[in-house]
C-alpha cells in the first residue's frame, strides 16, 4: 500500500503558473511524513518542485505542510527565490561535460548533438525540461534519492561555464579558444 502511494506521486507534474507568468513548475517528488505525538501520529507532506523559464533559468524548492497543495505552493515559492542561470550552447545543450555531487548523489551531464533529445531519468529530466534544454545525456551514478539527485544536478549546472569565461580565465582570446575547439572537433570526425 505504502509503495503504491509513493509511486503515484513520483511522476513529474508540469503546470503553468496560475498568474500566467513565464515560469513552468514541475512536481518532482512528494513524501508523506508523520510526527508521533502523545495521541498518535500527525501526518504531513513534503514536496520537491523544480521551476524554470525554459530560457536558461531554473530553481528548486522544498516545501512542507499538512496538506499537499500547500506544500507544493511553498516549494514553488522557494524555488522561485533560489533560481540560477545556466549558459546554454545554441540555446539547447551544455557547453561542456560536467559532473556534480551532493551527499551520495553523483550525476554526469554530457552535451549532445542536435536531435538527441533529453536522455535522463527521474528528477533530472524535470530540471532539463524546465531549464529549456533540448539535447543532453545525463547519468545518475550514485544515490537515486530525488533530493540528492536534484542537488547534485544543480551542483553540476553551477559548474557550467561559458567559453568566454574560460578564455578570460586562461588569458586567451575567445576566438582562439573557438578555433582550437573547431580543430579538435574536426579531428574527431
Curated annotation (Swiss-Prot):
The UniProt record lists the keyword Transmembrane: no
GO CC annotation terms, alphabetical: small ribosomal subunit
Keywords: Ribonucleoprotein, Ribosomal protein, RNA-binding, rRNA-binding
Gene3D superfamilies, per database record: 3.30.160.20, 3.30.230.10
Biological process terms in GO annotation: translation
Domain of life: Bacteria
Classification via InterPro entries: Ribosomal_Su5_D2-typ_SF, Ribosomal_uS5, Ribosomal_uS5_bac-type, Ribosomal_uS5_C, Ribosomal_uS5_N, Ribosomal_uS5_N_CS, Ribsml_uS5_D2-typ_fold_subgr
Domain S5 DRBM: 23-86
GO molecular function: rRNA binding; structural constituent of ribosome
Alphabetical list of SUPFAM superfamilies matching this protein: dsRNA-binding domain-like, Ribosomal protein S5 domain 2-like
Claim: Ribonucleoprotein is one of the keywords in the record: yes
Subunit composition and interactions: Part of the 30S ribosomal subunit. Contacts proteins S4 and S8.
Family: Belongs to the universal ribosomal protein uS5 family.
Domain remarks in the Swiss-Prot or TrEMBL record: The N-terminal domain interacts with the head of the 30S subunit; the C-terminal domain interacts with the body and contacts protein S4. The interaction surface between S4 and S5 is involved in control of translational fidelity.
Functional summary from the UniProt entry: With S4 and S12 plays an important role in translational accuracy.
Protein's recorded name: Small ribosomal subunit protein uS5
Species of provenance: Bartonella bacilliformis (strain ATCC 35685 / KC583 / Herrer 020/F12,63)
Classification lineage: Bacteria, Pseudomonadati, Pseudomonadota, Alphaproteobacteria, Hyphomicrobiales
Amino acid at each position: 500500500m505504502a509503495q503504491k502511494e509513493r509511486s503515484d506521486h513520483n511522476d513529474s507534474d508540469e503546470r503553468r503558473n496560475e498568474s500566467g507568468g513565464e515560469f513552468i513548475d514541475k512536481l518532482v517528488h512528494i513524501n508523506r511524513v508523520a510526527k508521533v505525538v502523545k495521541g498518535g501520529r500527525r501526518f504531513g507532506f513534503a514536496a520537491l518542485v523544480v521551476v524554470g523559464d525554459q530560457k536558461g533559468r531554473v530553481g528548486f524548492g522544498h516545501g512542507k505542510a499538512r496538506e499537499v497543495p500547500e506544500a507544493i505552493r511553498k516549494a514553488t515559492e522557494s524555488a522561485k527565490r533560489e533560481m540560477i542561470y545556466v549558459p546554454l550552447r545554441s540555446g539547447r545543450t551544455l557547453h561542456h561535460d560536467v559532473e556534480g555531487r551532493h551527499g551520495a548523489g553523483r550525476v554526469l551531464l554530457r552535451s549532445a548533438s542536435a536531435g538527441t533529445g533529453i536522455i535522463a531519468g527521474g528528477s533530472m529530466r524535470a530540471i532539463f525540461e524546465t531549464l529549456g534544454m533540448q539535447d543532453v545525456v545525463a547519468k545518475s551514478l550514485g544515490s537515486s534519492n530525488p533530493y540528492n539527485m536534484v542537488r547534485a544536478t544543480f551542483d553540476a549546472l553551477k559548474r557550467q561555464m561559458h567559453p568566454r569565461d574560460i578564455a578570460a580565465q586562461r588569458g586567451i582570446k575567445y576566438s582562439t579558444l573557438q578555433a582550437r575547439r573547431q580543430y579538435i572537433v574536426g579531428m574527431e570526425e
